Regions:
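Noncatalytic modules at the cell exterior or secretory-pathway interfaces
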Residues: 278-297
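Short, surface-exposed beta-strand/strand-loop-strand elements in extracellular ectodomains
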Residues: 245-263
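Beta-sandwich interaction modules
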Residues: 221, 254, 266-284
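Edge beta-strands of jelly-roll/beta-sandwich modules across compartments, strongly enriched
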Residues: 248-250, 295-309
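Non-catalytic, beta-strand-enriched accessory regions in extracellular/secretory proteins
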Residues: 205-231
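Extended extracellular/luminal ectodomain segments enriched in beta-structured repeat modules
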Residues: 226-238, 284-286
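Acidic, serine/threonine-rich low-complexity disordered tracts
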Residues: 23-81, 99-209
Length: 313
């Protein structure tokens, strides 16, 4: 597996030698880059929920945190909302100038620790997990890194100085399931257009996998403000649903504190949908969720609050 990853790293970074390369390599430490507003990276993301989902990350600002951090936004409002509700891309939002550190729970986390030199090691927290990282190799401005957690989870990632960011980033859980795979498809500068970042906060999630007699479920949740930024602009929901044949069905209703319906959905026999995103504007106070299931039926729901920022480049 290690040899396969090294081959992937070299292929992505273009470090396989040709007959004209002269066989020389440069193993000098890799320094921290400087990003400019408008720099962009096109990544393909794969998760257990999505396969080969493409997103363009764009530097929207370089003056965050009193001039010590960038703002890394996304060129699609839909993708920005998906991040807010699923939180599968840790490299959106504030990124520090010094180490390109992503923020988690309000603190910068040094996934990279510049200068990157072979054998260097450090610790950080990401995905609510503590990691011990090290640099496996450095060659031609490409640094190959690995990180491990106490539960057996691993991170394998490659930084390429020519693109000034990751060429690959892979998170594997203890059972061997890849929870996140980021592969760089393209990069450039001077992006033009609107870019977005949606600051999210978890509100409610549940999964039902039912079979047999009719079943009705009712629950409620309270929409509190963001701890720092106040009221949410919108509530973002994500859902998967599937009904078996015969008499299988699902009915879903979400009502606010005034009993006004905010979301209503019905699925009949054989109906299904996957990865649906939607929004409910200006959520407030308490919501009541009611779901009825008949026969073989599956429903997964996630709700998050969202506050949208946008920039025109």
């Amino acid at each position: 597996m290690g040899m396969a990853f090294m081959l992937l790293a070299c292929t992505l970074s273009g470090c396989i030698e040709t007959g004209n390369s002269g066989g020389t390599t440069d193993d000098s430490p890799v320094d921290s880059p400087t990003w400019d507003v408008g720099d962009w990276w096109l990544y393909t993301f794969s998760t257990p929920d999505y396969s080969d989902d493409t997103a363009r990350l764009v530097v929207a600002s370089d003056t965050e945190e009193d001039g010590t951090a960038y703002m890394l936004a996304i060129s699609s409002i839909g993708e920005a909302r998906r991040h807010a509700v699923l939180n599968h891309n840790p490299f959106l939002g504030r990124i520090t100038h010094e180490n390109l550190s992503a923020f988690e729970n309000g603190a910068p986390q040094p996934v990279l620790d510049f200068p990157l030199s072979e054998g260097a090691s450090w610790d950080f927290t990401l995905f609510s997990t503590e990691w011990s990282a090290s640099v496996r190799s450095v060659s031609g401005g490409v640094a190959v890194m690995e990180a491990g957690a106490s539960d057996g989870s691993t991170l394998d990632y490659v930084y390429d100085a020519s693109s000034k960011f990751f060429s690959s980033f892979i998170w594997t859980d203890p059972s061997g399931v890849v929870q996140l795979r980021m592969l760089l498809a393209d990069d450039g500068s001077s992006h033009s257009g609107d870019v977005y970042f949606v600051r999210g906060g978890d509100l409610y999630s549940n999964t039902w996998d039912e079979s047999g007699p009719d079943f009705e479920f009712e629950d409620s949740f309270f929409v509190s403000d963001h701890p720092n930024d106040g009221e949410w602009d919108e509530m973002i929901y994500f859902l998967d649903a599937a009904c078996g044949s015969g008499g299988s069905s699902i009915t879903l209703t979400l009502r606010d504190h005034g009993s006004i319906s905010a979301l209503e959905r019905v699925w009949g026999p054989g109906a299904s949908e996957s990865g649906t995103l939607g929004t409910i504007p200006y959520p407030s106070e308490e919501y009541t969720l009611t779901a009825t299931f008949t026969g073989d039926s599956y429903l997964r729901l996630i709700f998050a609050g969202g506050i949208t920022q946008s920039w025109s480049l």
